[in-house]
Amino acid sequence: VIKSSSGQGKTTLALKTQYCLQNEYTPYQLINCSDRGTLRHIVEYFHARIRLGEKPLILIDNLDAHLSEWNQLVQLMQSDVKYNYKILITSRENDWYNYAGDLSNIHSMNIIKPMLSKEEAAAIFNTLQQAGHIHPKIKEWKHAWNQIADKKLLIEYVYLLTHGEMIAERISSQMCEIGRNETGSIKFELLRQVCFADVCGIRLSTKKLLRSLAPRTVYDIGQILKSMADEFLVHISQDGDYIEGLHPVRSRHIVEYLHEYYPLEKTAYNITKLADLQDFSVLFSHYPEFSFDKVSFYSDVVN
């Protein structure tokens, strides 16, 4: 189990592990594990692969409600399959608290908590410097380390080294630039909703979002959305059905910036109307993380 806050490279570390072990193990990723009725089929599938000579390395990435039965799956695997496989799990701290379940019946589990250290920060700087990726404004690693030392987020540190500014500074600059544009207000509203949803671990239906925003602007909302994807402000799925933020850490910076004087509970309420029904449990599990008028919010939801 790789467990840490967003921005520490959990998924990258897990995928790197699968890559490094690909000569011995066959990599798999489990996307959904929320229905106990299907667990037996999953176990039977991997049992069949093992009988064919494979050694599966199964990734369960970013625990949430869609993967809530992972604990039961592990118990079934260890009783029915027993050997020649490994399971790799990544989770944010608060999601582990919500979805870990009873760990007493799991026979063997190692929990890794990656945290950027001072020594690693120096090594990363040297590696990036040798590759020519350090921004000219960055002269040495210690000053950059001191800027991120409170949270020690890997993503913040690497961004600072390679771009010469903090993510929050870049976000502030981008938002000011958007605000000067005639389509700024509708772009801000789109970013509020998409990034808030991203921080809550869900993505939004593109059709639902466009339908809700179209009446608020005289401009073509589809073209606005496309331009925002081209500017790497949001990410649209390959089939075009869903839209999400680029990364939870980046999305949180945008949410904080765009809600400095805008009620967060209003965005939270709007997201409840846009989220898919199957995402409700994930969405509402993250609401306690935010400071907003819960009484007003839940009153709007009920009414």
Where do the language-model regions lie?
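Conserved P-loop NTPase "ATPase switch" module shared by AAA+ and STAND
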Residues: 30-38, 45-78, 86, 90-93, ...
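C-terminal leucine-rich, beta-strand-based interaction scaffolds used for sensing/assembly
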Residues: 199-303
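P-loop NTPase Walker A phosphate-binding motif
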Residues: 3-28, 43-51, 93-103, 176
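Alpha-helical sensor/transducer elements of the RecA-like P-loop NTPase core
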Residues: 79, 83-144, 155-156, 249-250
